[in-house]
Regions:
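Amide-forming acyltransferase catalytic core, primarily the GNAT-like/NAT-type
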Residues: 4, 8-116, 128, 158-174
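Active-site/acyl-donor-binding loops of N-acyltransferases
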Residues: 2-24, 101, 108, 112-250
């Protein structure tokens, strides 16, 4: 049907023992409590945090609450010092769909607050392939780690999607400037470029690589690209960290 396993998702398993052993990481005591859809100030604060993420969904206040509780999700507001500092969309069993924080240094405290509220033994925390700040913070906290193809995706506009996620990757880590020219399924070739941290994609006359749709998905957007023969892209560009938070897939 055109959908291919793609995207990069790291998944961390976190137990109470992991958190207890890191009590020295405590920065700010946080509390977790259900969101109030009628509290406009709270909702505005949640949307501001959502919109500050490198990659995020775009919602109205009403849509945000509706999406957050889809598929039996629970929207928890994280507060510290009387202020909203983040939110967590999670199942009752501790499988987190999205955790957004004003400051990534609060990750330990946020996980403690969510675990305490839910009363569950294990939290499962997903992390986008572009989110190196989250990966650095969670490093000392997890019990197990796995890397997955995030989902099955179909890309309709390769230049736009490739440029967007190359930009997302460049925003989180240093990448070399460079240029990669591609054609997918015989469509107009395009040049994917990165210069001074800014990604772009534009039509070009010829392509260094002519790929099928399946090849393009595997090489550009999938963890499979880590083990398959690579195209000669600039170091560190591929695979591109295609990822959509699970609540945004509703």
């Amino acid at each position: 049907f055109g959908y291919e396993p793609a995207g990069l998702r790291a998944e961390y398993t976190i137990t109470p023992d992991n958190l207890r052993h890191m009590t020295a990481a405590h920065k700010l005591a946080l509390t977790a409590a259900p969101a109030d859809p009628t509290d406009t100030a709270e909702t505005a604060a949640l949307l501001a945090i959502q919109n500050s993420r490198t990659v995020h969904g775009v919602y109205t206040a009403q849509d945000f609450h509706t999406v957050a509780v889809s598929w039996d999700g629970r929207l928890l507001v994280l507060r510290g010092g009387g202020e909203v500092v983040g939110f967590c969309i999670t199942s009752d069993t501790g499988r987190i769909g999205e955790l957004a924080l004003r400051d990534e240094s609060l990750l330990y405290d946020a996980l403690c607050a969510v675990q305490q509220y839910l009363g569950c033994d294990v939290l499962t925390l997903p992390c986008a392939g572009w989110d190196t700040a989250r990966m650095q913070e969670v490093g000392p906290l997890y019990d197990r780690f796995a890397l997955f193809a995030d989902d099955k995706y179909q890309v309709f506009d390769y230049p736009a999607v490739a440029a967007f996620f190359l930009q997302a990757k460049a925003a989180q880590r240093p990448l070399p400037d460079g240029r990669l020219t591609l054609s997918v399924d015989g469509v107009q070739p395009f040049a994917l470029t990165l210069q001074n941290g800014r990604a772009d994609a534009a039509p070009c006359d010829t392509a260094d690589y002519n790929l099928t749709h399946a090849e393009a998905m595997a090489l550009l957007f999938s963890p499979e690209g880590l083990i398959r023969p690579q195209v000669a892209a600039p170091v560190g560009w591929l695979p591109l960290p295609l990822y959509v938070d699970s609540p945004d897939k509703c």
